[in-house]
Design a protein with these regions (language model features):
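C-terminal engagement/docking regions of AAA+ P-loop ATPases
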Residues: 72-150
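Helix N-cap and loop-to-helix transition residues
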Residues: 16, 40-41, 58, 83, ...
Length: 150
């Protein structure tokens, strides 16, 4: 339940060798936090959050999200599916994605785009899926496809 409190989980991957060398050199002489520049202030962030909160979600999208969540609870390789808190996170992130896409309403593609990042850390997979090396990204993709094909 601790991981359920985080909205999303992103995997940045590892830097290539040249970038790793650059990172080590930069950090050897100075604190990298001294180079951080603000790209947005507190009031602008709050305003964007309010704008995203006002994005329209149709009943069809709520139903679509509910079906995806339900599939996580029914999937044979998932021991523990998405909670109501997770469903709310899907909705919030889909609204933000719609806003960033220049729309004032959510479409299924918004939900699909954020689904893996919002959900992969929230599910607990069965031990047999780990043995078979099935990862959560594959399971999330399969769930989206199964709902699309209904």
């Amino acid at each position: 339940s601790q991981l359920d409190r985080f909205m999303i989980r992103l995997n940045m991957g590892y830097p290539d060798m040249n970038n790793l060398i650059e990172i080590m050199k930069d950090r050897h002489h100075e604190n990298p936090l001294d180079k951080v520049k603000h790209v947005i202030n507190k009031n602008e962030l709050i305003n964007l959050q309010e704008l995203a909160g006002n994005i329209y979600v149709s009943d069809e999208i709520y139903e679509y999200i509910s079906k995806l969540v339900e599939k996580t609870r029914e999937h044979e390789l998932i021991k523990l599916g998405i909670s109501p808190r997770g469903a709310l996170a899907i909705c919030k992130m889909a609204k933000a994605k719609a806003m960033l896409g220049g729309r004032d309403y959510v479409v299924p593609q918004d939900v699909q785009y954020i689904f893996k990042d919002v959900c992969s850390h929230r599910i607990i997979v069965e031990s047999r899926s780990m043995i078979n090396e099935v990862n959560t990204d594959e399971i999330m993709k399969e769930i989206i496809e199964s709902v699309e094909n209904e």
